[in-house]
Regions:
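Charged (often Lys/Glu-rich) extended helix/loop segments that serve as interaction or gating elements
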Residues: 202-249
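Active-site-proximal beta-alpha core segment in soluble small-molecule metabolic enzymes
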Residues: 1-163, 191
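Short, small-residue-rich loop/turn micro-motifs
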Residues: 91-93, 168, 236
Length: 249
């Protein structure tokens, strides 16, 4: 994700072959090679799509049917018949957290994803078709990915897609368990990788937190201690920085 630390983006671009997820057009100024952009659409229009394509962006993620319809309308226009894009549909996930126990706000219901994938399978403008989802939790119980993918998406859908992007959410260190928990998480991911390889599906990850976290240090203030609990003023969390950096919520 380029939004949270744009100063690192040029370094990553020069020294790796990774892609960059981008949420708003203003962030594109940090990336020289726009073909490495994975643009996550939100309430766009055909003019914005045309501008993005003109800059060389061709990888898109849509998380609602309305934005998908706008994209398909753009591709239908006669002057755009030669445009080739790579498209991923973002699917909702149910996360069994203590706070929510509900589906994440962003994303298309998996039933609709199954239907739309089959409709889009043979579109001449779409050179690669995939599914995207993203964890917002670090709960260990949420990493049984093979089981979830098999239950969320039909066999026909899995045969139709080229790529599965499981987003991020990978832990650096869990505060409430042992530091070796990452091994269990990545064992689950390897299981999914084997499962996807059997179906000729490319597995994509977004390990930003896992890579960046060891280099950062949170300076905070302990406001209270009671029983076995410590209350801290973690201002980065309290101010909801994502909402300030990416004003689309």
């Amino acid at each position: 994700s380029s939004k949270t630390n744009p100063d690192i983006t040029p370094i990553m671009e020069d020294n790796t072959n990774c892609l960059f997820s981008v949420h708003i057009s203003n962030e594109l100024k940090n990336i020289k090679d726009k073909s490495r952009v994975l643009f996550l659409a939100q309430a766009w229009d055909e003019e914005q799509i045309s501008q993005l394509v003109g800059l060389g962006v061709f990888r898109f993620v849509v998380d609602n049917v309305s934005d998908l319809d706008v994209l398909l309308s753009f591709l239908k226009q006669s002057e755009n018949v030669g445009i080739k894009i790579e498209l991923m549909l973002r699917s909702k996930l149910k996360e069994n957290t203590m706070r929510t126990e509900r589906h994440f706000v962003f994303g298309i219901p998996c039933e609709t994803v199954n239907k739309k994938i089959l409709e889009l399978k043979n579109r001449p403008n779409i050179s690669s078709l995939g599914i995207h989802f993203h964890r917002k939790t670090q709960n260990m119980a949420e990493w049984n990915l093979c089981y979830e993918v098999s239950n969320m998406f039909s066999e026909e859908t899995l045969q139709a897609i080229d790529v599965l992007n499981i987003g991020g959410g990978f832990p650096s260190i869990y505060a409430n368990t042992n530091v070796d928990v990452s091994k269990s998480v990545f064992r689950r991911i390897n299981e999914l990788k084997v499962f996807m390889k059997e179906k000729n599906i490319f597995l994509m990850l977004e390990p930003g937190r896992f890579i960046a976290a060891p280099a950062g240090k949170l300076i905070t203030h302990i406001t209270a201690i009671y029983e076995n609990n410590i209350v801290v003023n973690a201002s980065v969390y309290n101010t909801d920085m994502d909402a300030l950096i990416v004003p689309v919520k």
